[in-house]
From Swiss-Prot:
<dbReference type="GO" id="GO:0006412">
    <property type="term" value="P:translation"/>
</dbReference>
<dbReference type="InterPro" id="IPR001648">
    <property type="entry name" value="Ribosomal_bS18"/>
</dbReference>
<protein>
    <recommendedName>
        <fullName>Small ribosomal subunit protein bS18</fullName>
    </recommendedName>
</protein>
<keyword id="KW-0687">Ribonucleoprotein</keyword>
<comment type="function">
    <text>Binds as a heterodimer with protein bS6 to the central domain of the 16S rRNA, where it helps stabilize the platform of the 30S subunit.</text>
</comment>
<comment type="subunit">
    <text>Part of the 30S ribosomal subunit. Forms a tight heterodimer with protein bS6.</text>
</comment>
<dbReference type="InterPro" id="IPR018275">
    <property type="entry name" value="Ribosomal_bS18_CS"/>
</dbReference>
<keyword id="KW-0689">Ribosomal protein</keyword>
<feature type="compositionally biased region" description="Basic and acidic residues">
    <location>
        <begin position="7"/>
        <end position="21"/>
    </location>
</feature>
<dbReference type="GO" id="GO:0070181">
    <property type="term" value="F:small ribosomal subunit rRNA binding"/>
</dbReference>
<keyword id="KW-0699">rRNA-binding</keyword>
<feature type="region of interest" description="Disordered">
    <location>
        <begin position="1"/>
        <end position="32"/>
    </location>
</feature>
<dbReference type="InterPro" id="IPR036870">
    <property type="entry name" value="Ribosomal_bS18_sf"/>
</dbReference>
<dbReference type="GO" id="GO:0003735">
    <property type="term" value="F:structural constituent of ribosome"/>
</dbReference>
<dbReference type="GO" id="GO:0022627">
    <property type="term" value="C:cytosolic small ribosomal subunit"/>
</dbReference>
<dbReference type="Pfam" id="PF01084">
    <property type="entry name" value="Ribosomal_S18"/>
</dbReference>
<keyword id="KW-0694">RNA-binding</keyword>
Length: 106
C-alpha cells in the first residue's frame, strides 16, 4: 500500500509540473492564449504552370530541387505534388548519370 501512496504523490507532482525539473506551470501553454500561425498551402509549380516541364537536360531548373550538398529536396518543402516529384527524381537521376548535375558537392 505504501508504494501506491508514493506513486500517487509522484503523479501529482508530474501533473502540477513540479517533478523532473519542470518550471512549475502547466505542461504546455494554452493555444487560445496566443494567435495561431497560419501557414499557406504550397501549390505544385508544375501543376500551376502547364508550360513548365520537367526535363533532365535543364540543370538550372533541376538545381532548384536539390540542396547545395547535392541531395534532393523533399516534396513537403518544395510543394511539388507526388506525380511530379517522381518525375523530378527520375530527371535528377538521369542528369546526374550524364554529368549535368553533381552526385555530391564537397
Amino acid at each position: 500500500m505504501r508504494w501506491m501512496k508514493i506513486m500517487s504523490e509522484d503523479m501529482k507532482q508530474e501533473q502540477s509540473g513540479e517533478g523532473r525539473g519542470g518550471r512549475g506551470g502547466p505542461a504546455r501553454p494554452l493555444a487560445s492564449a496566443r494567435r495561431p500561425f497560419f501557414r499557406r498551402r504550397k501549390v505544385c509549380p508544375f501543376c500551376a504552370d502547364k508550360g513548365l516541364k520537367i526535363d533532365y537536360k535543364d540543370p538550372k531548373m533541376l538545381s532548384r530541387y536539390i540542396t547545395e550538398r547535392g541531395k534532393m529536396v523533399p516534396s513537403r518543402i518544395t510543394g511539388v505534388c507526388a506525380p511530379h516529384q517522381r518525375k523530378l527524381s527520375v530527371a535528377i537521376k538521369r542528369a546526374r548519370n550524364i554529368a549535368l548535375l553533381p552526385f555530391i558537392v564537397k
